From Swiss-Prot:
Residue ranges, annotated region (Leucine-zipper-like): 153-204
Protein name: Transcriptional regulator SUPERMAN
UniProt xrefs under Gene3D superfamilies: Classic Zinc Finger
Main location: nucleus
Reported induction: Repressed by KRYPTONITE/SUVH4, member of the histone H3-K9 methyltransferase family that contributes with other factors to the CpNpG methylation of the SUP gene resulting in its silencing. The alternative epigenetic states of the SUPERMAN locus have been called Clark Kent alleles. Positively regulated at an early stage of development by LEAFY and by B class homeotic proteins APETALA3 and PISTILLATA. Later expression is maintained by both the B class homeotic proteins and the C class homeotic protein AGAMOUS. These two steps of regulation require the intervention of additional factors.
Region of interest (Disordered), ranges: 78-115
Domain notes: Contains two overlapping leucine-zipper-like motifs at the C-terminal region, which might serve as a site for protein-protein interaction. In this domain, a slightly degenerated ERF-associated amphiphilic repression (EAR) motif seems to be involved in the activity of transcriptional repression.
Molecular function per GO: DNA binding; DNA-binding transcription factor activity; zinc ion binding
Miscellaneous remark of the record: Mutations in SUP cause the ectopic expression of APETALA3 leading to the development of extra stamens at the expense of the central carpels of the flower.
Name of a matching Pfam family: zf-C2H2_6
Localization (cell): Nucleus
């Protein structure tokens, strides 16, 4: 009888310990309640700016503050770049650079005949042709409109690279063998023209 009482006493003790308000699982819940009191972290966390050591209560506020430092650094770079003449050239090419001088002298590892056209501004009287094929013959852009609008266009003749003046370009546009590819954005509507981008070798 005493043995059964001691077993009951042990079970009741361990049972209470498991359901005690200070058990391990309840301590975690209590700790979580302490960390997030009324939806806010407690104690409040602070985020420190690495440049000026100013502290912020949220990561979003720190991010907005870092944008100010980015603008300041950009201004500093712009002010320093004209004063220093021996700075290395940037890795990005200048979009306003004229490539016509580079196109006239081929690189050492390529053959003299290059398939790339000379990139000239629209006012330039000369054009170099490459191998480009087929715009739809249903084009609403007539040769007269192409000459009137001062759009930059590549004039292509089958396989032969030639140079034209702007007067010759209008004459050649009337020829069925020449295809004009307008380089202006938004000039070709998908519903009006269909561009064939298939690569072909030799003459078609």
């Amino acid at each position: 009888m005493e043995r059964s009482n001691s077993i009951e006493l042990r079970n009741s003790f361990y049972g209470r310990a498991r359901t005690s308000p200070w058990s391990y699982g309840d301590y975690d819940n209590c700790q979580q309640d302490h960390d997030y009191l009324l939806g806010f972290s407690w104690p409040p966390r602070s985020y420190t700016c690495s440049f000026c050591k100013r502290e912020f209560r949220s990561a979003q506020a720190l991010g907005g503050h870092m944008n100010v430092h980015r603008r300041d650094r950009a201004r500093l770079r712009l002010q320093q770049s004209p004063s220093s003449s021996s700075t290395p050239s940037p890795p990005y090419p200048n979009p306003n650079y004229s490539y016509s001088t580079m196109a006239n002298s081929p690189p050492p590892h390529h053959s003299p005949l290059t398939l790339f056209p000379t990139l000239s501004p629209p006012s330039s009287p000369r054009y170099r042709a490459g191998l480009i094929r087929s715009l739809s013959p249903k084009s609403k852009h007539t040769p007269e409109n192409a000459c009137k609008t001062k759009k930059s266009s590549l004039l292509v003749e089958a396989g032969e690279a030639t140079r034209f003046t702007s007067k010759d370009a209008c004459k050649i546009l009337r020829n069925d063998e020449i295809i004009s590819l307008e380089l202006e954005i938004g000039l070709i509507n998908e519903s009006e023209q269909d561009l064939d981008l298939e690569l072909r070798l030799g003459f078609a």
